């Protein structure tokens, strides 16, 4: 993973996708900027692309050696932009079309993960209007858009609540007609970063996330001080090893490539570890988990970015980086 040359990407033209039209645009702008800066430090010529409807024409005109995907949310991590890049014949980073689409769809990804023997939450899909009208399961439970990331649109309904979140019935609700409703799992929030390597995926570490509000929502993820990351997580060795194993298994079961982040809940009273989801485009902001875990494993951010590029080239071209 360590480049011998301090400028190993000299003479390489890399287009970084950042921003985009999703609800996670602001996070993507920060992630993409971090990627672009690292690539420039590694010697690459970088074109920053905030994709719109003309993204195919823009990328065709740029003709980059590689597209570095720094997008989050719909269109950027659900298989759509990956399909565009496949059609254009461009090498790109992170997971491909099918894995991206599966991981973004909570219902489908849970089915795949469960079939692989991975513990996942119960619950199911409901029409958002039905959920807004009354409890579809006894509280506490969690309501999530079926195809969003970064906890966008997520609500926690506590015991004693008079009813479910009213915003589900709002005319300006923009997160799809179906929502995933799952029983709330008490305990610890854990995360594991995984990097795919030629001899199999490697899980970096286990982080415990402690939110200042008690709920790891969008603000807790991306606001300074919104959460505290405890690395390594203060959990028994057996639980750590189980989380590392399940994260690698989830990465493989969904067919992911490059880097992913698996999010877990651990009920420490009942010793229950549950995989919530696998993120194929994990954040790379100053408050993000993957760069922290890489650093903990002795991998600098620039080395991590170089590895992502190296992995993408190796998948597209037999000779890897020229």
Swiss-Prot record:
UniProt keyword list: ATP-binding, Cell shape, Cell wall biogenesis/degradation, Cytoplasm, Ligase, Magnesium, Manganese, Metal-binding, Nucleotide-binding, Peptidoglycan synthesis
SUPFAM superfamilies to which the protein is assigned, alphabetical: Glutathione synthetase ATP-binding domain-like, PreATP-grasp domain
Co-factor note (free text): Binds 2 magnesium or manganese ions per subunit.
Catalytic activity annotation: 2 D-alanine + ATP = D-alanyl-D-alanine + ADP + phosphate + H(+)
Positions of Mg(2+) 2 binding: 277, 279
Cofactor(s) required for function per UniProt: Mg(2+); Mn(2+)
Listed pathway(s): Cell wall biogenesis; peptidoglycan biosynthesis
Domain ATP-grasp: 110-310
A Pfam match: Dala_Dala_lig_C
Enzyme Commission no: 6.3.2.4
GO terms for MF: ATP binding; D-alanine-D-alanine ligase activity; metal ion binding
Main location class: cytoplasm
Binding site for Mg(2+) 1: 263, 277
InterPro entries per record: ATP-grasp, ATP_grasp_subdomain_1, D-Ala_lig_Van_CS, D_ala_D_ala, Dala_Dala_lig_C, PreATP-grasp_dom_sf
Coiled-coil region list: none
PROSITE patterns: ATP_GRASP (PS50975), DALA_DALA_LIGASE_1 (PS00843), DALA_DALA_LIGASE_2 (PS00844)
Binding locations of ATP: 137-191
GO cellular component: cytoplasm
Gene Ontology biological-process entries: cell wall organization; peptidoglycan biosynthetic process; regulation of cell shape
Stated role: Cell wall formation.
Family: Belongs to the D-alanine--D-alanine ligase family.
UniProt name for this protein: D-alanine--D-alanine ligase
Organism: Caulobacter sp. (strain K31)
């Amino acid at each position: 993973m360590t480049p011998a040359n301090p400028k190993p990407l000299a003479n390489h033209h890399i287009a970084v996708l950042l921003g985009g039209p999703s609800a996670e645009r602001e996070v993507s702008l920060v992630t993409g900027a971090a990627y672009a800066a690292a690539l420039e430090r590694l010697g690459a010529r970088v074109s920053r692309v905030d994709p719109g409807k003309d993204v195919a024409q823009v990328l065709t005109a740029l003709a980059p050696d590689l597209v570095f995907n720094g997008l989050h949310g719909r269109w950027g991590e659900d298989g759509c932009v990956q399909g565009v890049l496949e059609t254009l014949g461009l090498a790109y980073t992170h997971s491909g079309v099918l894995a991206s689409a599966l991981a973004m769809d909570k219902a489908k990804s849970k089915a795949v993960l469960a079939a692989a023997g991975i513990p996942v939450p119960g619950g199911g899909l409901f029409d958002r209007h039905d959920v807004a009208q009354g409890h579809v399961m006894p509280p506490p439970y969690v309501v999530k858009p079926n195809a969003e990331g970064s906890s966008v649109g997520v609500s926690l309904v506590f015991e004693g609540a008079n009813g479910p979140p009213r915003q589900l019935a709002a005319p300006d609700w923009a997160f799809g007609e179906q929502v995933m409703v799952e029983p709330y799992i008490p305990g610890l929030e854990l995360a594991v970063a995984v990097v795919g390597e030629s001899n199999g995926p490697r899980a970096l570490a286990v982080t415990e996330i402690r939110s200042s509000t008690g709920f790891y929502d969008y603000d807790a993820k991306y606001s300074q001080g919104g959460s505290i990351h405890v690395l390594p997580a203060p959990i028994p060795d057996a639980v750590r090893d189980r989380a590392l194993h399940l994260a690698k298994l989830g990465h493989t079961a969904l067919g992911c490539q490059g880097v992913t982040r698996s999010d877990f809940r651990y009920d420490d009273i009942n010793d229950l570890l549950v995989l919530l989801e696998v993120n194929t485009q994990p954040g790379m902001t100053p408050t993000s988990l993957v760069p922290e875990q890489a650093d903990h494993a002795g991998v600098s951010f620039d080395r991590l970015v170089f590895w992502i590029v190296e992995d993408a080239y190796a998948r597209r071209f037999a000779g890897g980086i020229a």
